[in-house]
Amino acid sequence: MAKLNWICLLCILTLLLSGCWSKRELNELAIVVALGIDKIDDEYEITVQIVDPSEISMRQASTQRSPVVSYHSRGETIFEAIRKMTTIAARKPYFAHLQVVVLGEDLAKEGISDALDLIVRDHEFRKDFDVIMSHEATAKEVLNVLTPIEKVPANKMLNSLDVSEKAWGSTIAVNIDELVNTLSNKHKGALISAIEVHGDKKLGVDQTNVQRVKTPVLLRYTGLAVFKGDKYIGLLTESESKSVSFLNDKIQSTIEIIACPNKGTLSTEITQSTTKVKGSFKNGKPKIDVHINVEQNVGEVECDIDLTKNKSIDYVNKKTAQGIDERIEKTVEKIQQQYEVDVFGFGDALHRADPKQWKKIKDDWTSIFPDLAVVVHVKVTTQGSGTMQNSLLNKPKEE
């Protein structure tokens, strides 16, 4: 009996210990936090941004070494280029902590489906990293820029993307799963945020870029990249990108500016925005109604408007709604006529509204979308005016 117990114990221990057979020590890995993919002629050029743990540790005094290092490699396929990187890196690149993938603009113009295959297929890549596109720069040039405040440039790109999406609305964070799902929908176009290098790209790689009060080279998000199928076809301006975010119910907060009745301007802070898209068919003809409800506070007043009066608040509400409405309508028209791709999910709304009617038109959606009737309704409510009601320019009348 005792012998049987020992055998059972050994079997249990064998099962427990087998879990460590594939372990890899931290000092044996090169932790990749950002991956750049460019297309040079018929080859892929891969850039990996690898963290130096000793340089970002709070316990260790700062040295003159960079907190990250970039390695570059070329290959006929991305898989080959990554493996060839072991000839220059002291450790094998490890992608389980990847935070962001930067797609080069030239690659995006050719098509991104092939480039995404490995990172979607390989088990080592987690599926929660964001995907962005470089604009007027290669992915390599973007990942070579050292950034102030955030020691790791990948963190800077990720944090700026998140903060801008929440406070301004001209960017959207799109992870790899969301992008692949959109690319798989032949009736919908994809959108990803575009980033560019401001300043001399050659200076961005130097440590002095983070040692000056006025940083000479910066990474800046510049709008949304529009894809038709898997190909990049154009860039939306900051204003157009915000309009798309309103339509896609992505606005969490932003700023609106209106002209005052006499002269000067007034700024408001959007605190909440809710968008509902309704599709319908009339005599077989599709139509989209967009209802946007906005709540805001007065943020800055540079005119003599009297905010204690209801008619002034009504004026602010009306002008804000009018401004949002006009920008959205112009953006929709541009996307319909210039890009001819449904980045709003209007096709999905029509499918939900009437599956039978949608089935009749879905194969012709590409030709129907440019002439689709889209009606936008914007309602704005102003809830507060901050810690003071009127501007210092609004002087009370003498009695």
Each model region followed by its residue ranges:
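Membrane-proximal alpha-helical signals and transmembrane carboxylates
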Residues: A2-C8, T14-E399
